[in-house]
């Protein structure tokens, strides 16, 4: 399939239009601000797919309606999905602003004394507020000289945070969520809400019955040569763990091989359904070759599939990872049990960071007292106040083992363009593939089993839908924790030792839902959550504001919270502001 062009960032240099000396004296400085902004973004950021970001600068500085319209015409023809307006001087507020109501927009007003860039910033933001088109304000903390072309650190932070979030918004627009199956075991997140996807994310929902997956497997609607490559890769890289099934449920070698083959086929077919595959067109299967333009997907599995066929654990784990038999590549976003709301949290995290996401059950809160009672050992270090056991049946991205390394040699999860083949191999080597427990999965399957290395910063998120309110976002920054082996083995065995585990310690604030670890668990809005690498809660907050999704729980420092300027007019408490502003403006794509 032909790739749909990626959204670009438009840079709008605006200027005082008075000729005979004023405009002429500002042209170079204004255009240099635009060029510096574009250079910063292209150097520091990439699309989630790894492609370089393109910035489009207006052909001329913008002084009024005519040049603003010319700029808009250029942007419309080049798929600009985000705009940043820059100026070092006074300009004519409402005459020069970006009026597209669905495009994220920011204004950087240069903090200098020679010309009043701050005055234009304030005037333009007032126009945005009055017209109901929110914009983000960027204004440096310290005064700069007029000939200073550097971008201060605080301005850079806001430019990049805005650009990351804005591109996420633009990248999701027009894509689809592929719902394979329906509601899994009554899980509310798998009651896929079309209005949420359409109104808040600008996406469609493609609903496909699981029989379509069955048809593709049975009728060989896949690349048969790729299947052989996938099987050979699995034979080389898969380490098999203990089969904990009773003797009557253990499978022989031939049966196990059939389960592995079908598990790999599920991964291939779900991928093809998401993004298409030209190899199918070569087989005369043109319709199937197109895919569904899906940027995220979910697979129901339980129980209508898994009571008879291999579960989705292997397929989901491999798709969500940054590598497979084709080498290192962009991870997909595939939600276990078709939990579309957790899938959206995964999608947001992937778009912001370019990394794989760890889907998990928020399974158990272990208090220090309970751990010591069960193991005879105290929790220490990051775990001293208690831990949350994040574990599911084996569909978490294998990157979650954290066998990749950052520039300082510390364990991490990296965007795929930074991952070496050796790091991918290390993640595979850290993973065991355990036969699925028959009582859970009568059709068999393999669950990935790994343990996340400790001391790694993570952000846990979840989207929930509240009747009468709409979607809300939860955020909990914290760290993975490494427990003594004997302690881990004892605690892990009490749940299911054939599944992947992350021991998570949220950062506590002593207030509200972050009073203690128990409160974090008690306030979590659903049975699932997502781990995104790094302390990136501030990026999630900015993105949520763009989409008009209020944040109902977070432990991000107030100084890092960055929302549109109009939020400040919705009260003095910043979280109440968020709720009132999101309600006032409504969903980004409201109809």
From Swiss-Prot:
Its main location: cytoplasm. GO terms for molecular function: arabinose isomerase activity; L-fucose isomerase activity; manganese ion binding. Pathway: Carbohydrate degradation; L-fucose degradation; L-lactaldehyde and glycerone phosphate from L-fucose: step 1/3. GO terms for cellular component: cytoplasm. InterPro entries: Fuc/Ara_isomerase_C (IPR004216), Fuc_iso_dom3_sf (IPR038393), Fuc_isomerase_C (IPR015888), Fucose_iso_dom1_sf (IPR038391), Fucose_iso_N1 (IPR012888), Fucose_isomerase (IPR005763), Fucose_isomerase_dom2_sf (IPR038392), Fucose_isomerase_N/cen_sf (IPR009015). It is found in: Cytoplasm. Mn(2+) binds at residues 337, 361, 528. SUPFAM superfamilies: FucI/AraA C-terminal domain-like, FucI/AraA N-terminal and middle domains. It comes from the Bacteria. Its cofactor is Mn(2+). Its EC number is 5.3.1.25. It is an enzyme of class 5 (isomerase). The keyword Protein transport does not apply. The keyword Cytoplasm applies. It catalyses: L-fucose = L-fuculose. Keywords: Carbohydrate metabolism, Cytoplasm, Fucose metabolism, Isomerase, Manganese, Metal-binding. Homohexamer. Belongs to the L-fucose isomerase family. Converts the aldose L-fucose into the corresponding ketose L-fuculose. This is L-fucose isomerase. It comes from Citrobacter koseri (strain ATCC BAA-895 / CDC 4225-83 / SGSC4696).
